[in-house]
Amino acid sequence: MRKIILASGSPRRKELLELASVPFEIIVSEVEETIGAYSSPSDIVMSLALQKASAVAEYNSDHIVLGADTIVTYESRILGKPSNEAEAKEMLQLLSGKTHEVYTGVAIIAKDKTVTFYERTEVTFWELTEEEIDAYIASKEPLDKAGSYGIQGKGSIFVQHIQGDYYSVVGLPISRLVRELKQFNIDVTHA
């Protein structure tokens, strides 16, 4: 039987697959993420997810490999993971009191088939005070997350409204993924 391999070291993606009872192993993709001249955030996340999955699939061609990538956008500006605390603060100030978009792209690669898809979710933040932002940054939580916040952690207190898939904002649209895996004859709904 073909194994499912997650090409990511993200603890959040690991937790979501476990939550859905998807059997998998982890092989972290060491690919250097490169963003080319893409026309849209959806193209970017699907391309990055495919790069990650392809790097692992190259040496695991008998198995099914999952890659994923998440970005936050606000007014056509891409907000990836902050490089330092100052950049995290700048991002949180930018998102304060506003609605932004979170895109998560997923690639599923098997020997005979490749599927890519994305989910787009709108997230609206409350107005944030400087003290709230500083305290959050001091927790270190935002430093490894796209857009400088984790909706599943302390960053949840900043969220006023969400429209779309919550789990996509966490890092993996698990409901859609489970449905897409059926194309590969993997059905975890009866597990």
Curated annotation (Swiss-Prot):
Domain of life of the source: Bacteria
Matching Gene3D superfamilies: 3.90.950.10
Gene: maf
PANTHER family: BIFUNCTIONAL DTTP/UTP PYROPHOSPHATASE/METHYLTRANSFERASE PROTEIN-RELATED, BIFUNCTIONAL DTTP_UTP PYROPHOSPHATASE_METHYLTRANSFERASE PROTEIN-RELATED
Protein name stated in the entry: dTTP/UTP pyrophosphatase
Cell compartments where the protein resides: Cytoplasm
Function statement: Nucleoside triphosphate pyrophosphatase that hydrolyzes dTTP and UTP. May have a dual role in cell division arrest and in preventing the incorporation of modified nucleotides into cellular nucleic acids.
HAMAP family recorded: Maf
Class of enzymatic activity (EC top level): hydrolase
Keywords from the named record: Cytoplasm, Hydrolase, Nucleotide metabolism
EC number: 3.6.1.9
Family statement: Belongs to the Maf family. YhdE subfamily.
Entry's Gene Ontology cellular component terms: cytoplasm
Single GO MF annotation: dTTP diphosphatase activity
Xref: CDD domains: Maf (cd00555)
Any one of the GO BP annotations: nucleotide metabolic process
Cofactor names: a divalent metal cation
Site positions for Important for substrate specificity: R12, T70, Q152
Matches recorded under InterPro entries: ITPase-like_fam, Maf-like
Entry annotation: catalytic residues: D69
Reactions listed under catalytic activity: dTTP + H2O = dTMP + diphosphate + H(+); UTP + H2O = UMP + diphosphate + H(+)
SUPFAM superfamilies noted in UniProt: ITPase-like
